[in-house]
């Protein structure tokens, strides 16, 4: 879960529209004395408080026993036979001193009064009409002044005796709100509901303090946001979530295709791609879980807007929601560990010569997959104990709890270590470039390009998540769009750079495409064997120059003209342009032996001087070569595109590639 999810779902994935209204009105009403940092909001009832007595049933205690021995309490207790009323001086110190005594004890103390028990039994109402229906036909005994019933758009407050501090359980249906705590509403001595503190105007419907309902992490989040324009924050978060879903879908597609490429072609199975594949698997797992949760929340939000009911499949399923978030954090932790392995392996191969000959795959696998299991298990256990999932909140806001640093601490350490690896790798690259006598501008360009390419692979862009500016909506928008663009498209960028734009991968794909086309009846697409080696067999026609027979040092050697292209390549790209005649005879020996057996000879022993090639075979070979050249000449532009990367096809094996060549190739692209 991210800060974006906290702002989107803050106070209620179940009732997003209601919580948006709560935040808007909480911000407009100012801080409360009992919770200076929490939100508060005004009642929406248009009824004027009167001295008429009406009562209906309520679902939670409205009165709270106050310890008379407390020095801050100047109140007295009055027992009129109907209810036990605490006359309290509503000073901030007194409100802070109110104890959170057991609700059942309060109910037990008031059991002797039947009318008051009705008030404490239930007060379930979902709108103004329901609240009105509860109280309009019930009359209290003439025992004193009462504040009239009122509906504050969240709770239905029954008539309350004058001078009483009414407390009602916090409304359900919101994430980040503890329903075991109480919202507070003050009935003044004159029978009117009290306005918010420091208010310049009297508000007849009164004011409800919902500050105590928020959990500590939500209060800290509201402190960070500071601004009162909560609608702007929520709107920015929604647009960012749309951008995030698009990036995750694109990353998922690119990562899956890259995994298929790495697993299909055996020539790509080297040490670097083994690490790449594990990193891609961790990223795919993380993206799939995140998309599942986001789409479930999106579907739930749309349905609630129309029906005001929760249709969430994941959140309303016991253990499924918790398991989803635990798996999400495990996948994220595994992704960071494999990013660390990427940085460690590349750094050691470039800078430490002792690691170049070894590849501890088992150690890397345990570090990348087993260590995150241990970390996630410890975090999940601590979080479940801290959050009390019996409230049905499904680990919501767990990223705001202190236990989240069990996971976030090692991730931050991985980012910092990879940043150090990156700095050292760039230092080595600059040293190599200086030895090549490149210009300063060229050195800087290649170093910066290599650094930019390595940033997503090493996960350094995730460092921006730790720097969330929430003081103003503008700063939050810049941070939100930029950070979530980089993180959601991270998988796409990694797959693009390290798979689709990799020269070796493109060469393998090109060769596979050419082979498939040649098998399907397009011989002109067949890859030439010569392109896989440093030298090539000379297929020039017989009109090519031949060394004079009188020269003993060059007898029997055929030489290609210096400016003639060989097999579609320049002469400078071939290290061998001459083929010895004995080698040709050696290739023809099986044919000569078969011909001798047909004539009935038991054994054929010929030396290089005795063996003569069959002119018929040579004629057939020349004819086939001429036919191939004619077909090639007809589709020259196609062949040029297909085998434009034949130089890349001559990449040596992974073991012989210099360790720093990976970074150099990236800087050249």
Swiss-Prot record:
* Family that this chain belongs to: Belongs to the G-protein coupled receptor 2 family.
InterPro entries from the UniProt entry: GPCR_2, GPCR_2-like_7TM, GPCR_2_extracell_dom_sf, GPCR_2_extracellular_dom, GPCR_2_secretin-like, GPCR_2_secretin-like_CS
Q: Which GO terms describe its molecular function?
A: calcitonin receptor activity; G protein-coupled peptide receptor activity; neuropeptide receptor activity
Tissues expressing this chain: Mainly present in clock neurons of the brain. Localizes in all 4 s-LNv neurons, 1 LNd neuron, 7 DN1 neurons, and 1 DN3 neuron. In addition to the clock neurons, it is also present in approximately 13 pairs of neurons along the ventral nerve cord in third instar larvae, which do not overlap with dopaminergic or serotonergic neurons. Not present in DN2 neurons (at protein level).
Membrane topology of the entry: Multi-pass membrane protein
Specify residue ranges for compositional bias: Low complexity: 26-40
Function as written in the Swiss-Prot or TrEMBL entry:
Receptor for PDF, a neuropeptide controlling circadian behavioral rhythms. Probably regulates circadian behavioral rhythms through coordination of activities of clock neurons. PDF-binding results in the elevation of cAMP synthesis. Plays a role in sleep regulation and regulates the state transition from sleep to wake.
Give the principal location in a single coarse category. membrane
UniProt keyword annotation of Membrane present: yes
* Keyword check for Membrane: yes
Per the record, ranges on the Cytoplasmic side are 266-274, 356-366, 433-449, 502-669
The segments annotated as topological domain Extracellular are 1-244, 296-334, 388-411, 471-480
Protein name as it appears in the record: PDF receptor
Domain of life of the organism in this record?
Eukaryota
